[in-house]
Amino acid sequence: MSDILTVYGNLFINTKGANKMKVLIIGAHEDDIEFRNAGMTMKFKELGHDVRFLCLCNGNGGHHILSPEETARVRKGETQQVAKILGVQYDIWEDVSDCEIEPTLENRKRLTRYIREYNPDIICTHRINDYHADHRATAQLVQDASYLLIVPHFCPDAPAMKEMPVIMQTVDAFKNPEFRADVVIGIDDEIETKLECVRCHRSQIYEWLPYTKGETVPESEEERREWMKGMDITADTTDEEVLAAKRGYSVRFAQVAARFRKELIEKYGEEKGSKIRYAEALMLSEYGKQLTDENKDTYFPF
């Protein structure tokens, strides 16, 4: 007896074992993607779907001591560690320098060709309102390419996609306009691996970012691990305590759950949703295929 297929647009879901979806997560810098979407990536991978990361610059500006060339080399090595942990292909535009991503026509064509070649069902990237010019430019490039993905005469050397992908924007704390959590994902089961991915970016979390904030980093590895987390998040830690905390990556990921507690309860129910400690969140872009009540759980089945 053949397996039953449920069809949503161009997405075929095998109800006894899903056909692969393709998920493309586009970030400006090495670390942007896993800091925001490592938990979701693990959930997609566990279900047998394919996830690819694309970074639009080489990160060579992210250090205060190393040369740009050495910084790019170190950061590429850090991404390779993450790729191994998560089991993803992690591509980098190595010819683009940090702080120099531009939403040019040339880059629009380059990104359009890349997306068409991969043919993803879902794209995730930054929002346009962001403090960093590279984040804004990356978001602008994705937005500019979105409709063109299905236009055959634009970049005719790369076959146009048959249907636009769902385009999602990754969580941030900016207020103008404020982030809206259209998709929330509890990641308590994935948090330790996500923190392991964060620790891969040693040049950033222990060197460059503390330097920019005037922070002193402990010397021993054990102390660094605790310092990096910021605080212990337990079942008794309240959302108010989490939101009041000032630093740390455990705190950062717990604050997403605290901010969007209402949405987590709506999705998972009161008993489970109220207890989720760590979460990731996504905002739907109006420039891609739209999520509906009928297809939302198909695209985000966790």
Where are these regions (language model features)?
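Short beta-strand-loop elements within alpha/beta enzyme cores
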Residues: 110-133, 283, 287
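C-terminal accessory domains and tails appended to enzymatic cores
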Residues: 2, 8-19, 177, 183-302
